[in-house]
Amino acid sequence: MSFLGLRAYLNLIYFDFLLARGNFASLYQKVRSCPVAMSSSHPDVTEKVCAAVNIACIWYWKEVLCLQRSAVTACLLKRYGIRAQMTIGAQQMPFRAHAWVEVNGSVVNDRPHLREVYAVLDQC
């Protein structure tokens, strides 16, 4: 596992801990306040971060839910200079909620048509 993969895995543990304590507000605040680095050093950093998070999720000892996965992805992208936003959306029938990450209005860690399925509730 690469250094980026290790960072993703450790962030999965951290955000899992917050969610296990029922502390959505802390998770939300951490993602919102995560600073964006001045510049990205690699042109394909978005793909590399998403791939590292995917691999970390495979090796994680339990199922990683969309909120945890999106929080990790958004924070890592911000740390590497990408203005990422964790997006939370919901649909009415049947009721479902989902979280994903967008960069410049495009979904980067999930299916690209999510905005057509879910009404956006918030972005951070």
Label the model's feature ranges.
Residues M1-C124:
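Helix-boundary/low-complexity linker signature
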